[in-house]
Amino acid sequence: MDDVTKALNLVPMVVEQTSRGERAYDIYSRLLKERLIFLVGPIDDYMANLIVAQLLFLEAENPEKDINIYINSPGGVVTAGMAIYDTMQYIKPAVSTICVGQAASMGALLLASGASGKRYALPNSRVMIHQPLGGFQGQATDVDIHAREILALRARLNEILAKHTGQSLETIAHDTERDNFKSAVDAQAYGLVDQVFGQRQEELIQSS
């Protein structure tokens, strides 16, 4: 691992004064105490397990208080994203989603699936929706099986987007035929987020 890679992988530490003296946290653990979760980078099984564990932990800690997920992701594995989605819908606390940077593919679906009225995007963030990608190779019968699975996944993802955006299934199917990029304002108009803001809102501070 070169010096640049090591530097990029460094996680800042913060020091907090407690009744027992100083305690050091990595920045993400400290923010988790404030019920802030970061979904950053490609969505794979490892990331999904981390996000699901954090959601379940915060629910156990306080089932009545909102959880905030900050999303900056190009998307990733559909089944991993669905594990996060199902957990967001399953737990009792309302889950607010905030797009910083980009929310593409499964990242966009998770952004849209936040609690109604609590889905946000920063003004220069980008959102992209599209159909699931396939690239299976092998025997013709196996290719056919995987093709039918992709079509089933596509139908289910379209249903979820339609549910959370208020768009019709026909509109979602048409708009996800190809990569469909949207600005934060366009994402709000489409129903992917509820609000675009450049400064932290007072109600978001209080819900945290």
From Swiss-Prot:
Top-level enzyme category: hydrolase
Gene name of the record: clpP
EC number: 3.4.21.92
UniProt-annotated catalytic positions: S105 (nucleophile), H130
UniProt protein name: ATP-dependent Clp protease proteolytic subunit
Annotated source species: Xylella fastidiosa (strain M12)
Entries under CDD domains matching the protein: S14_ClpP_2 (cd07017)
Pfam families with a match to the protein in the record: CLP_protease
Localization: Cytoplasm
